[in-house]
Swiss-Prot record:
GO biological process per UniProt: ATP synthesis coupled electron transport
Membrane topology value: Multi-pass membrane protein
Name the UniProt record assigns to this protein: NADH-ubiquinone oxidoreductase chain 4L
Record bears the keyword Metal-binding: no
Molecular functions per Gene Ontology: NADH dehydrogenase (ubiquinone) activity
Length: 84
């Protein structure tokens, strides 16, 4: 799990396209969510499941807002990229 998070963080830092950065952030959130669900089932705790549902809802809202901002940016500039 830690290796996946590390690889995704490196992918997040090294990319030049904002859409792939949003995808990397979504995969990171889903990795944390899967870990919460697993730990909730191991320790028989309902709070991990409830918190993971909240994370999924927030990730969906973040995706919608991020993609709408990217579409607006693309219409304004004609390209979608960033510099670090």
């Amino acid at each position: 799990m830690l290796a996946l998070i590390s690889i995704l963080l490196l992918f997040y830092i090294s990319q030049n396209n904002l859409i792939t950065l949003l995808i990397a952030i979504e995969i990171l959130l889903l990795t944390v969510t899967v870990k919460l669900i697993y730990m909730g089932s191991v320790y028989d705790d309902i709070y991990g499941t409830i918190f993971s549902i909240v994370i999924i809802i927030l990730a969906g809202a973040e995706s919608a807002i991020g993609l709408s901002i990217l579409v607006s940016y693309y219409r304004l500039r004609g390209k979608v990229g960033h510099t670090i």
